């Protein structure tokens, strides 16, 4: 499991699909344990779509300095709210950016690796400040840290 602790005190707890998406989960856990996500923001939060974070630049263009392949045969589809998936710029461009869905987004099936699901903190997800990075002047809501809870 992972807990996204927000700077304002809210928390979102996520179950990670390590059996279905082991490379993606390993990358997320590694970055979280290194403190990579500490102080980053939800830089792109679009109504009726998703909340995206994990970019150290806060613009949508940043990452960890490497990319890795997609894991698309997980057996999951974008059929509901609360799915955790990798943001990318096309096939094989996963890095550090992730998103959590607000609604079913079936048009993303086969394009993004789903590697977890929100299990607590839906109120925190709902409370994230809407933000279009192309027009926003204020930074997004700040992630204090992402803590990995071993089960």
Enumerate the predicted regions with their spans:
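Cyclophilin-like peptidyl-prolyl cis-trans isomerases
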Residues: 1-151
